[in-house]
Regions:
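Core segments of cupin and vicinal oxygen chelate
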Residues: 8-52
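Short, conserved charged micro-motifs
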Residues: 15, 77-82
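Residue-level marker for the onset of beta-strands and adjacent loop->beta junctions
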Residues: 4, 25, 32-34, 68, ...
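Short glycine-enriched loop/turn motifs at secondary-structure junctions
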Residues: 1-2, 62-67, 102-103
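N-terminal beta-strand motif that seeds the catalytic metal site of vicinal oxygen chelate
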Residues: 1-14, 68-70, 125
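Short connector loops at helix/strand junctions that flank enzyme active sites
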Residues: 33, 40-42, 63-67, 87
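Vicinal oxygen chelate
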Residues: 82-125
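Short beta-strand/turn micro-motifs at beta-sheet edges
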Residues: 56-60
Length: 125
């Protein structure tokens, strides 16, 4: 078994779209009219919130903007990730620090998306 996708709630579609595309390099994918997702290789981040039509009413208590905690793999040295974040005007809240990840030990930095969700970049190099 493996993970297929995650869901993130956003409060402002345009602002989040720019962040996830420009800062994290996501591909914007329209799943159906009004339903969007960010794709990172073979992983997908579905988007809920204002300006995005819900696919179903399956989530009785939806995730609120700013309540997510996601980790992305950074391909390259973690110092380059810090430089990338700083170039986009983002503050690193913690790191670089050693962390265990899905592939073993790595080095991580933590920062926030526009809604306050905690994001992590981990490098295994």
């Amino acid at each position: 078994m493996q993970l297929d996708h995650f869901v993130i709630a956003v409060s402002n579609w345009e602002r989040s779209n720019a962040f996830y595309k420009d800062v994290l390099g996501a591909e914007l994918v329209e799943q159906s009219p009004g339903r969007w997702a960010y794709r990172f290789g073979q992983q997908q981040l579905n988007v809920h919130g204002p300006g995005v039509e819900p696919g179903s009413n399956v989530a009785q208590i939806p995730v609120q903007p700013g309540n997510s905690d996601l980790c992305f793999v950074w391909r390259g040295p973690i110092e380059a990730a810090v430089e990338h974040l700083q170039a986009h005007g983002l503050a690193v809240e913690l790191g670089p620090v050693s962390r265990p990840g899905a592939r073993g030990g790595g080095t991580s930095v933590y920062f926030r998306d526009p809604d306050g969700s905690l994001l992590e970049l981990i490098s295994y190099e």
